[in-house]
């Protein structure tokens, strides 16, 4: 509304807060749009945005902002302007003056304050080649903290899903006909991948044991591509702006994201990662469409006995592609995880969510409960405990304890099996889910 935006313009109507941004709620993602100009029109305001995000925002169809007649219009907030700094605890970085302005909380003394300014986006990068992969490195009891990620304030940020941002995207009219397995396609998109504090690519058996990933400006740990093996065990992921942990390709940069990914060289696929007994909490604090764990085009990945809480969107996402066509994904397992207090900000959501064809994959003996119910979601009824989304095929969903029987099977392919899920599942399964006894100390780390 014009009342809010007036603080960003001068008496002549010119934008004085030249780095101001709008963060716009878009169904299952939020977009960061840098404001180029503002024109107040009575009780409304017309806002224009910088490129490249302006074109992508108005040309891509999904996810989109909602404008409805029943009051479910998309929420937004304004940020990155000193003129908006009016609540204790807020800060603003003036990049031209090279100053940080901070509004102290009651009782805070700046003379005694510890101030940490992140300067890098990636702390550790492990990368070889397909023919000469980096092998057998173990990180143990190391804390990875305080990274930044500047791209949203330099080029905007229009995610498609799971924090993967569109580098290009547009609507197709008329729709593109695909093979008989898949419904017609109404859009195309190409994706970029957010930065990560620790990046692993073209490697074998890179392990993380009892490490901490905290206070990070984007993804915590990322097994990007061409990684075989690797154990992530007993780690804490907390206070992270984006995704906690990513595994596998979410479509290469030049690959249209709705096309199945099935490389001729199988070494390009991330396989045999084991993620267990980790605690994920306060994830996606800035990029609300992010998850605790997101695995894309992967094979033989095992995600088990983790606890996930306080996330803005889904807890675990497995798969990619929106297609029933068989691809490189197979033999994945999500087992005995405890997911609670999820969907703090976004709907079209579930504790565990799947995409695409994944032969011989299993979602079993997990426990999901306690969804948030924010008042600004696009559809207050569009939430689920378990959700097999577009193209999900050949996946067995069995013996999961959920506090209700609210599930969705949307545009699924063949071969899915749903058995014995809901509140009547044996309480032993509910009690066994989550961190095993030797790792419950993670819940008490300050």
Feature locations, PLM:
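Active-site beta-loop-alpha junctions enriched in small/polar residues
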Residues: 250, 319-321, 357, 391
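Short glycine/acidic-rich loop motifs that flank beta-strands on beta-rich extracellular proteins
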Residues: 121, 148-154, 195, 217-223, ...
